[in-house]
Amino acid sequence: MNKRKFFVFMALIMSLSLAAVSWAAPAVDTVESPIFTKQIAAPVDEIDSLTLPDPATTGLQSRWAVVPVSLTQNRAGEWAWQSEIPFDSSERLSVMLLSPHADQWQVRVTAPGRTAAVPMDRHNGFRAAYHGAAYATAQFGLDHNQFPAELLTFERVPAGTWQVNITANNHLATRGQTVDGYLVLSGDSDYQIYTHLNSHELVVGQSIGLETFVFNAAEADGQQPQADPGLIGAATLRLTAPNGQVDTFPMQVNRDGRAVANFTVNEVGGYTAQVQVEGQTATGERFMRTSEHAFPVIAAAYRLNERVNQVRVIGQNRLELALPITAVSNQTPDVMLGAEVWGRNADGDMVPVTWVGGITSPAETRTGLYLPLNLDMRWLSLADTKPPYELRNIRLQDVDTQIPYATADSIRLVLPRSVETAVERMNVTAVNREMLMGPAPAADSITNNDNPASAYVGGSRLLLVHGYCSGGVWPTGHFSNYSVFQDFNQNRSHNQFAQLINSHGSQFDSFGIVAHSQGGAASLHLYTYYWSGLDWSNGNRLIQSVGTPYQGTSLAGMLAVLGDIFGAGCGTHWDLTYDGASLWLSGIPSWARSRVYYHTTSFSWAWWRYDYCSLATDMFLSDPEDGVVERWAGQLSGANNMGHKTGWCHTDSMRDPAQTHDYNRNVNMNANANR
């Protein structure tokens, strides 16, 4: 059995403010827990969903413009900034200021066709120079990673060039950055830009790029956007490296309407990128749009060699395939490994047999390093295939970002004659759990009951799990026989988060999960890749989630940009971007997804008012949404959709109540939960 055992140490500290929350439970004890990886597989009809995503399909649609504000001193001694911003929206326009010092700025906005500027009056709102103009404050962010914002809203104003003037008596340094803040304009125009990475191989030394184009959202009607040629006048890319260096690249505008800029990444760490597009709509109105992106670059680790150099039987029905690799540094990290197995059918055609994968550690023999990949021989019998066999679409990925270290189209797989004979004697007609997950370890081996220093409790529990950069969100009075997972106000990858949940859950013999936001994805990750108390639990629903961005959120990139001026806060999160989420989902089989029961929510609606969860995040999200997660991005294909409910928002800082406080839903989840 491919068993990897290590210890995860978790020290969780709860702040005094969070301890005062009425539903907070006692702090989690520090525990040590063994982790056993699963040897995962999937049937042939899932192979298409388990391929690496095309980055062209995981891009960001933008109807907004984010303009950097950099104050300079004028002759009068004032610090000032002025900009003219073309915008084609003619119905409703929102203007938002984001800066640590925005409350000390004097702001004047002149609408298209007007000569009188409208000053911001923070005590009385906007002076009524335009019908329906309003001033408001809000918070922009995700869970507790929030930044203060000021918003100006105009109704029924003409399209054209907006002029914004900002002055300040003093220049307050913003963390040594050249940018003091950001001005955001967002409207209701159908003309948007679609921007995507051209590669997910985000490894040091690689040349990657961003591609953008303008499209008409009304014509796209929810389908994959297509470029409208001739609308882009100019496009630029502003790239910020991990060391803070900022480079600006002109983007080449092609005849097909796509603008492209390529660059080489030479440093490990987090990058932010902003694409700015200016052009004219089909009716001749000038516009500006931007899109904001965050992505990590990882160090190179391995190269794949050309063939499987050893196949050995490691247990009843189990084979270990040794994939030879070459380490390109002195680091040999664990990897996510995935591959399709193909063989020849009775007609002589090569056909898929299964998809296999999981998290694995490199091993060493006299001939060098290899990665063990496990295959259940019963898949070969089920597919009724014979030699020759081969692996296709092989990928080695980083366990925390799912970024590919290396890929290969195909590798020849030669099985020993004894294995071929064993397969010929089989008559497998159905798939069982062991074929999908590998052999299970002993039930007591996944707890910490053999560690005298641990806080082993035993029994079964319902784990209440929070999300990214979050505190205690679940009112515990709505639940019974529960244990509160506490890793408050932290930024974890799905893999790190999953291991921490397992560490907490190892106090018990079995558990089910109710999770909020990222906690739902981390719980699914745990069930997919690791053996845990989830696998020995009983009940109607294994994992239940509320407000989980399974397909990502558009806020992730903007949060990274704001970190440059406000401070990092909880930091950027690749798994919560559209790109990172799609890479992660490409390794999650349907047998794991089918054990998830998910809920989505959005704001309440009334015909006579403008509806939202958060005024600030609404500028970046498509309706319906909960202030963080768009309804479409909260869907998990292959899982159980428990419905969409209005009148509930992502957190308690939004207009409608927090979705985790819904008593009726919580009581229902409690009654049906595994434990």
What residue spans do the PLM features occupy?
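Flexible, membrane-associating and regulatory peripheral segments of lipid-active enzymes
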Residues: 101, 376-465, 469-474
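Beta-strand-rich structural segments
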Residues: 204-223, 322-324
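Surface-exposed beta-strand/loop patches in noncatalytic accessory domains
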Residues: 55-74, 100-148, 242
